[in-house]
From Swiss-Prot:
CDD domains: 5TM_YidC_Alb3. Keywords: Cell inner membrane, Cell membrane, Chaperone, Membrane, Protein transport, Transmembrane, Transmembrane helix, Transport. The chain crosses the membrane at residues 13-33, 321-341, 343-363, 409-429, 461-481, 506-526. Belongs to the OXA1/ALB3/YidC family. Type 1 subfamily. Signal peptide: none annotated. The keyword Transmembrane applies. The lineage of its organism: Bacteria, Pseudomonadati, Spirochaetota, Spirochaetia, Spirochaetales. It comes from Borreliella afzelii (strain PKo). Interacts with the Sec translocase complex via SecD. Specifically interacts with transmembrane segments of nascent integral membrane proteins during membrane integration. This is Membrane protein insertase YidC. One of its GO terms (biological process) is protein insertion into membrane. PANTHER family: CYTOCHROME C OXIDASE ASSEMBLY PROTEIN COX18, MITOCHONDRIAL (PTHR12428:SF65), OXA1 (PTHR12428). Required for the insertion and/or proper folding and/or complex formation of integral membrane proteins into the membrane. Involved in integration of membrane proteins that insert both dependently and independently of the Sec translocase complex, as well as at least some lipoproteins. Aids folding of multispanning membrane proteins.
Amino acid sequence: MNQSKRILRTVYLSLFLIGLFMLINDIFSSWMLGSKSSDKELQFDLNKSFDDNKMLLSKSNNFNLIDKAQDIIVETGIYFATFSTFRGNLVSLKLKNHLNLEKDPTDLINVDYKNEPFFDVSFDYLVEDLFLYKKIDDFNHEFKAYFKNNGKTYEYVKKYTFSKKNEYLMRFEVIVNGLEDYNLLDIDSYKITFSSQIERLSDKAKLQYNNYLSQIIYYDNKLKYGKDDLRINNPKWIGSSTKYFEVLVSKENMEVEFKKEKGILKSFIVNNVINKKNISDKFFIYAGPKDNRYLDIFDKNSDNTFGLSDIAFGMSVEKSLWYLIQVPMQMVMQVFYDVIPNWGLSIIFLTIVVRILIFPLTFKGFRATAELSKLQPKMKELQVKFKHDPKKLNEEMGRLYKEEGVNPLGGCFPIILQLPIFFALYSLVNNLFLLRGANFIPGWIDDLSIGDSVYHFGYKLYFVSWTDIRILPFIMMFTQLGSTIVSSNIDLKNLGAQQKFLYFGMPIMFFFILYNMPSGLLIYWITTNIFTILQQYYIKMHLS
């Protein structure tokens, strides 16, 4: 095997593993993708408290105090919450501080509330009339209704409590009183259908954010994904999760089951009511960024408004195989950001620091390659001499390597050892929530979590799934080619047609693979390529 082929195979083996890693990551993300109403409007005083006695009397006379559905909008420091008097449900929950591509607040509970509400409680179907609303204060909101069975009227209340500290958490309570002689239609439990679409994105947004929706559950100290017919007793929490946001639900002593209905996986919370005179169940709902800065505060009761502890919401953030490498990398990025508040520059500086740290490995690999190249004349002589005897050729080659003290794989190992660092950086830059919406170069790279854009088509190109003209992928391709040429030290004139195809085809292949990747990832890749070119020139000068 001549020197150029060996170097090419080493480089392409590394690139193949990188491509395989990204392909598996993309497939895994895609895999996870997995009544009564009134259209009349109502105008009434939302701040007026309801009269329980008057309401109860009106129910007994089958008269509706409120016979028209009403949306009630509540604003907190972090949410725009919309409730409906139809079943007293939360129908929209928008994050004020996190905008989507259309520059609108991200909606975490974007559902068809009349047909598929966010928290669909079994009792809702027993209520014939609309719920009455009462604002306790800015953080506490109550909905009340009554339902009848066997001539008796039962009080049914839903309470919503928001955090006073602008935490991404709310408490939801289900209260049913007067069950001493009522067995809830001979059932021993009631169900809540948990449904959260977490922002029904436009086709552009789905492609840009590489978005997926997965049903997740945490039990036995493990993060699992929901599947059909799965039933779990007393998990820590269940939830719906995307790349950057999630809605998680926690309750003591709950049972959860997953069922596929019309091809859609749904989750159900089963609540026991055996021997209960009254029902008073509390659910804690996290609805916000998929970011440990906001999730981990619920593991210590002194850190959050509701006094929760050991909820383990932070375990919803998937940990990659390279997590231990990613942690110090993110810390270094944060240090750079604190000095210069620009995440794009932080990525560049982090990349340079990493490349400097692994320079000894790079230098060792290049030196091994240089030592091997000195043997080319002797290797060619052996190849000519034993061209009809491959077995003898291998024996003589081995003897030559041993006599000269050269390891033919010496240039491969340093490259392979660097791959975990690349994978860790790739995973960090591709998934870090802090990069969502982070501006690097205004007017060009406005969001490091999606691809850059200089022109938007308004439609998707069929064969390549392109929606925009992007500049970074072209820069990446040319710098990748330059990096490969400099690193390989190959005379292009001596390459065969097949080798030239592989030589130029690999950067082109990665151009298509990475075209729609987050711009933050491409900035890392381009910085690596440029640093490699400069580094290889320095090494060549040093060795010469």
